[in-house]
């Protein structure tokens, strides 16, 4: 029963739609009706600007970090990564936003922040290097995931981490399939650092 409660709580944490809340409370708009319609940090940056984008991205990451920490905080014998994955599912298919959520990147990163801080920092490094070169947030997210898979397979012996990272990366690619088509067609929007404040 305790295990089920932890997993349900993790899903509900992940379901908190920070992009929707920030858009409605802070700006009076439903972000699902603007930009890509995605409830995530990237769309928030594009539609509402840097400040709102940072708040949403940090909030989405925090969901993953808190969810992964639940088994430890409550001394429940369940793997933190499993709770973290439940939060990612909640973020992507949130019960509080008609199951229309984000693309799993920030919340997945938050899970890694709790479980493997070194991997988190190296992921962030890869993300920003690719972002600096390509100016594509989507490509940066996917290649950071590829790096994570390679790193966990060849440089760790943590089987649960390998499985979780592989599944999350595959899921991130799935959620970015429209972005992949736009990158191939050269119609994917590139980042613009200046936005509405």
Curated annotation (Swiss-Prot):
Which PANTHER family does this one have? GLYCEROL-3-PHOSPHATE ACYLTRANSFERASE-RELATED, INNER MEMBRANE PROTEIN YGIH
Q: Name one GO cellular component term.
A: plasma membrane
Provide the top EC class.
transferase
One GO biological process term is: phospholipid biosynthetic process
What does it do?
Catalyzes the transfer of an acyl group from acyl-phosphate (acyl-PO(4)) to glycerol-3-phosphate (G3P) to form lysophosphatidic acid (LPA). This enzyme utilizes acyl-phosphate as fatty acyl donor, but not acyl-CoA or acyl-ACP.
Which reaction does this chain catalyze? an acyl phosphate + sn-glycerol 3-phosphate = a 1-acyl-sn-glycero-3-phosphate + phosphate
Q: What is this protein called?
A: Glycerol-3-phosphate acyltransferase
This protein's membrane topology, according to the annotation, is: Multi-pass membrane protein
EC number in record: 2.3.1.275
Q: Where in the cell is it found?
A: Cell membrane
The membrane-spanning stretches of this chain are: 5-25, 70-90, 111-131, 153-173
Q: How does it assemble?
A: Probably interacts with PlsX.
Q: What UniProt keywords are attached to this protein's entry?
A: Cell membrane, Lipid biosynthesis, Lipid metabolism, Membrane, Phospholipid biosynthesis, Phospholipid metabolism, Transferase, Transmembrane, Transmembrane helix
- InterPro entries hit by this protein: G3P_acylTferase_PlsY (IPR003811)
Q: Which family does it belong to?
A: Belongs to the PlsY family.
